Amino acid sequence: MARKIINKKRYTIATLGSHCSLQVLKGAKDEGFRTLLICEKSRSGLYRRFNFIDDMIMVDNFSEISEEFCQKRLNQTNSIVIPIGTLVAYMSSEKIESIDVPFFGNKWILRWEADRSLKQKLMEEAKLKTPKVVKSKNDIEKLSIVKLHGAAGGRGYFLAWNKETFEE
C-alpha cells in the first residue's frame, strides 16, 4: 500500500515554465500541494493567468536554477522540483546534479535524458520497441523521421525518403 503524504501544504511542487509545466502544476494543485513556477521573465504574462500557480521565481534564463538565490528560495518554500526536458536542454548533467534542492526522481538519470545514445541504450535494455536508428544519411532506404540534435517541443524534425531528400 502506498504511503500517503499527510501534510501536503507543507510541500511545494516546482518546475520550469515550459511546455508541460501547466499539466504538472495543475495536477499538483488538484492533489492539494502548493505550486511554484520557475519562469523566464519574458514569459511571465502567459503564466500569471493561471490561478493554480501559487508562486513564481523569475529568471532571465533557466540555467539560473543552479544559482544560490534560486536554490535558497526553492528550499525556503520546501520545494520538490519536478525535472522536465527543458532543464536538460539548458544545463549540463553536472550542473543539474550540483543543485542542492530535492528533485522528484533521480538527478543522475537525467544524464540519460541528455545523451541520445544513453537514452537509446536505456530503452533497448528495457526491451522497449523502438524505431530503427539510421546512423548516416547514406543509409536512409525508406521514409524516415529525422530528429536534429537539440530538437524539442515538436520542432527540429523532418521527413526524408533518402539521402537526397535529407539534404533538401
Task: Describe the role of every protein-language-model region.
Residues 14-16, 38, 151:
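Short hydrophobic segments within beta-strands
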Residues 17-22, 42, 87-90:
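Gly/Ser/Thr-rich loops at beta-strand to alpha-helix junctions
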Residues 47-144, 151-152:
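Conserved N-proximal alpha/beta basic substrate-recognition cap immediately N-terminal to
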Residues 10-13, 34-35, 77-81:
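Short active-site oxyanion
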Residues 33-42:
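Short internal beta-strands
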Residues 1-31:
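N-terminal phosphate-binding or glycine-rich loops at protein starts, especially the Walker A/P-loop
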Residues 143-168:
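Glycine-rich phosphate-binding loop of ATP-grasp-fold ATP-dependent ligases
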Residues 31-32, 98-100, 162-164:
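Glycine-rich, phosphate-binding/catalytic loops in enzymes
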